[in-house]
Amino acid sequence: MNYEIVIGLEVHCQLNTQTKAFCGCSTAFGAPANTNVCPVCLAMPGTLPVLNQKVLESAIKLGLATNCKIAPYSIMARKNYFYPDLPKGYQISQFEEPICSEGYIEFDVDGEPHKTRLVRIHIEEDAGKSIHDIGDDTYIDANRCGVPLLEIVSHPDIRSAKEASAYLQKLRQIVKYLGVSDGNMEEGSLRCDANISIRPKGQEKLGTRTEVKNMNSFKSVEKAIEYEAERQAEVLDAGGTVVQETRLWDADKLETRPMRSKEFAHDYRYFPEPDLVPIVTDESMLQKYAEELPEFPEKRMSRFISEYQIPEYDAGVLTVEREIADYFEETVKISDDAKASSNWVMGDVLRTLKEQSIEIKAFPVEPKRLGELITLIGKGTISNTIAKKVFEKMLSSSATPTQIVEADGLAQVSDTSAIETVIAEVLAASPNQLEKYKSGKTNLFGYFVGETMKRMKGKANPKVVNEILTEKLQSA
């Protein structure tokens, strides 16, 4: 039987605030166990939480960026369950009245536009961490307790694993552009649970869904969804029924396995958080946050095409990440050459980032220095070939391109008499090639250029070399 996959995603986005959601403890990653804690984190009697204003700001901005309705009045709620790494015995979250609802995200899959509706975006706190790899015992690290999260819940509008991955990548791009999260899936800043069901094609009624967890990359999201859909199809084709449960994705065995029976909302016994006042928003607050939103990729891409006259492909690559787009614009301010700047950022800069596995914020060559390098090429001070060598030195030096060129004697030679002398030597040393050129094998022009550049150690101005060589060959 032919089945249709129906997918809804629940994404937990860890916010990059300096302090936790309901207390002043640091959210710094990697601190020694149980050092970023306080009586509020540890649920000591008599402690009271206070909502971090930055968390509310991040929630509203993400809601605005995803076309949500922002609630004028919303409340926090207690989500009750027992787990060793949850000292309170409940998690502060939102239930009936979330801060954001009824939004949507638009994205492309293989060039085709798609739109996925959002049920809600709500604020909640993270639980602690259980550590199982120290001897035979289990230990608890409460550092993560209270770290702020936003949960983004989609409608079951997604119809393929590839579409789910594209949706997730778009959401990641949005939170990174907003600056509310680093969106790092491998480190758990963006955690995705997929609710997956299948139904016969053409049928409206939804099938029984399973929730799949433990997917820490876009590729694992795709593979887990594909596997789970195939597993459910095999169960139904064999005459069985799909069990509503939570399953864990095993990236080593490339399969899902049962984790626990799927909980329902009533299992958590939600009720309003009595220790926190309701969240009230107004038009002036929303207007303020709306004005602080960044220029998002689609608009920035269109502006790059019109303002800088660069190809659509270039603009698309440069605007995937906000920091890359910023870097490009800062470079153009110095170089005053958008296309050359685009070529360098898309080529040598992105290549180096990939090779060194670093983010642009850690890239050692600042836009100012790259812009200066491009300017030196434009002025004819150095050739593109020499510029590549200068760029490599800039990666491990704080010197300016001009300083490197002067120190290493890399300035381009444009002196016509010096170049004429070398070209004469090349032609004199290549009688056979010269005769073949005269006979019509004009592709040997490149050979003469190469020999000239080799003798001048790449310092000759290519434009001047071409002009003089053309003149000499025509009169030979």
Swiss-Prot record:
Gene3D superfamilies: 1.10.10.410, GatB domain, N-terminal subdomain (1.10.150.380). Belongs to the GatB/GatE family. GatB subfamily. InterPro entries: Asn/Gln-tRNA_amidoTrfase_suB/E, Asn/Gln-tRNA_Trfase_suB/E_cat, Asn/Gln_amidotransferase, Asn/Gln_tRNA_amidoTrase-B-like, GatB, GatB_C_1, GatB_Yqey_C_2, Gln_synth/guanido_kin_cat_dom. GO terms for biological process: glutaminyl-tRNAGln biosynthesis via transamidation; translation. GO terms for molecular function: asparaginyl-tRNA synthase (glutamine-hydrolyzing) activity; ATP binding; glutaminyl-tRNA synthase (glutamine-hydrolyzing) activity. Keywords: ATP-binding, Ligase, Nucleotide-binding, Protein biosynthesis. It catalyses: L-glutamyl-tRNA(Gln) + L-glutamine + ATP + H2O = L-glutaminyl-tRNA(Gln) + L-glutamate + ADP + phosphate + H(+); L-aspartyl-tRNA(Asn) + L-glutamine + ATP + H2O = L-asparaginyl-tRNA(Asn) + L-glutamate + ADP + phosphate + 2 H(+). Signal peptide: none annotated. Coiled coil: none annotated. Allows the formation of correctly charged Asn-tRNA(Asn) or Gln-tRNA(Gln) through the transamidation of misacylated Asp-tRNA(Asn) or Glu-tRNA(Gln) in organisms which lack either or both of asparaginyl-tRNA or glutaminyl-tRNA synthetases. The reaction takes place in the presence of glutamine and ATP through an activated phospho-Asp-tRNA(Asn) or phospho-Glu-tRNA(Gln). Its EC number is 6.3.5.-. This is Aspartyl/glutamyl-tRNA(Asn/Gln) amidotransferase subunit B. It comes from Chloroherpeton thalassium (strain ATCC 35110 / GB-78). Heterotrimer of A, B and C subunits. HAMAP family: GatB.
